[in-house]
Structure formats: structure tokens, C-alpha cells
């Protein structure tokens, strides 16, 4: 915001941070109903505080995005929307995706991207296990190691060999581990792109459009 407006300006924010330990317990039990209700309640608190736009700053919880979005009367910006717009602008249609097991296996992000002309390529089972474990056992606890970085690089390299044109960092913690130049293809960080789009909304008041590719199915 300051970079665009100048001076001493900053983004006016209302933040509601949930206890991830509770969320992790619900995730381990597959209790998405509890997660949905809890996040709907938090969204309503933000709306009551005067928020003009709400962002769910996590990829995994977007499995219940639609339920949360319909529970409030202000717009919500899907975390994948700015990433899809960036991929479309770059002319990319087939990309590797790394995230939690839920994001990689449950299909909700796969469908969201595919409907907009982007095919997500997921790691194999061993790769998904490794990516997920590093997120939950290390990154969410602030642990960043070179060993885990190499594992991620190998997983991405395998997907690039299969035709991935870029990699989507589909978990907000992965940017702690990987930086531009760590892999051979462009990286698109959902967290960073989400923040940029929200910053633009704060500056100009224009809600980002929902990118829809002219070819709404991608079966390549």
C-alpha cells in the first residue's frame, strides 16, 4: 500500500487469527463441518467490524470457502484467483502444485483451477507424503532445513520432467523454504499473489475479477 500511495500510508486491516492447533485436530479427524462453522463465525466477526472484503489466508481451508462466502454479505477473495490470473497472463496451462495433503488430494483446488483453464499436476504418493509432512512437522513450527528444500526441489523436478511449465506454491508456509531460483521453472506463490491483490483492492477499491478461461475444461 505504501509503495502505491506513498508517504506513511499502510493498509487498514482487521485481523482474526485462529489457533491452528485446534484446526489441526479437526483436520486429523476429517471434521470439516466444525472447521466450516468456526470459520463462518470468524468471518461474521470481521464483517461486523466493518470489513469491506474478507480474505481466508490459507489454501487448505478453501475447501469450505463457498460455505464461508455465503455466510457473509461482503465479498471474499479466493486465494487461487490472483494466481490463476497470473498464470493466464503468462500463458501457462499446466503447472505443478505443492500443498498440504488436503489441498493436493481432495480436489477442491484442482477443480477450481481446471475450470479456469489451468491443469494442476500433483506429486506421486511418496512426493505428496513428503511435501505434507514437511509442512506440518517443520514449516508450521518454523523449522526450515536444507534437507527439506532438496526434497521439494526433487519433487518439483520430477513434475517438470512430466511437462509442468511452472510450480504453484499452494501452501502459505512453502515460501519459507523455497525462493526464486531454487527451481528451474517460474514459481507462483498463492500467498504473495493473494496479498498483492488485496493490497490493490485497498488502494483502488476495485475487487479482483474472477478469471475464467475461454476454454473452461482442460483435459490435456
Go through each PLM region and give its residues.
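Short, flexible loop segments at boundaries between secondary-structure elements
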Residues: 127-130, 188-208
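A C-terminal functional module that forms or caps the active site or interfaces directly
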Residues: 136, 149-193
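N-terminal glycine-rich anion-binding loop in soluble enzyme alpha/beta folds
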Residues: 1-38, 105-106, 110-144
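Conserved beta-alpha
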Residues: 75-129
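Short, acidic/small-residue loops that bind anionic groups at enzyme active sites
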Residues: 5-8, 68-89, 122-123, 183-198
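Short, well-structured alpha-helical segments in soluble
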Residues: 34-49, 150-164
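N-terminal glycine-rich "phosphate-gripper" loop used for MgATP/nucleotide binding
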Residues: 49-65, 164-173
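Short hydrophobic segments within beta-strands
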Residues: 16, 97-98, 170
Amino acid at each position: 500500500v505504501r509503495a502505491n500511495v506513498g508517504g506513511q500510508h499502510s493498509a487498514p486491516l482487521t485481523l482474526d487469527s485462529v489457533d491452528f492447533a485446534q484446526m489441526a485436530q479437526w483436520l486429523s479427524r476429517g471434521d470439516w463441518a466444525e472447521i466450516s462453522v468456526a470459520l463462518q463465525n470468524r468471518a461474521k466477526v470481521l464483517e461486523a467490524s466493518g470489513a469491506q472484503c474478507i480474505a481466508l489466508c490459507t489454501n487448505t481451508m478453501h475447501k469450505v470457502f463457498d460455505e464461508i462466502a455465503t455466510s457473509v454479505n461482503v465479498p471474499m477473495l479466493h486465494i487461487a484467483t490472483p494466481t490463476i490470473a497470473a498464470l493466464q497472463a503468462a500463458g501457462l496451462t499446466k503447472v505443478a502444485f505443492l500443498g498440504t495433503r488436503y489441498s493436493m488430494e481432495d480436489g477442491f483446488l484442482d477443480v477450481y483451477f481446471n475450470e479456469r483453464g489451468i491443469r494442476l499436476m500433483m506429486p506421486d504418493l511418496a512426493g505428496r507424503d513428503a511435501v505434507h509432512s514437511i509442512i506440518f512437522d517443520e514449516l508450521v513450527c518454523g523449522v526450515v532445513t536444507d534437507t527439506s528444500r532438496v526434497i521439494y526441489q526433487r519433487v518439483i523436478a520430477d513434475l517438470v520432467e512430466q511437462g509442468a511449465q511452472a510450480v504453484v506454491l499452494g501452501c502459505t508456509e512453502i515460501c519459507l523454504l523455497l525462493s526464486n531460483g531454487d527451481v528451474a521453472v517460474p514459481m507462483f506463490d498463492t500467498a504473495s499473489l493473494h496479498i498483492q491483490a488485496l493490497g490493490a483492492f485497498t488502494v483502488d477499491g476495485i475487487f479482483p475479477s474472477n478469471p475464467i478461461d475461454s476454454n473452461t475444461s482442460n483435459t490435456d
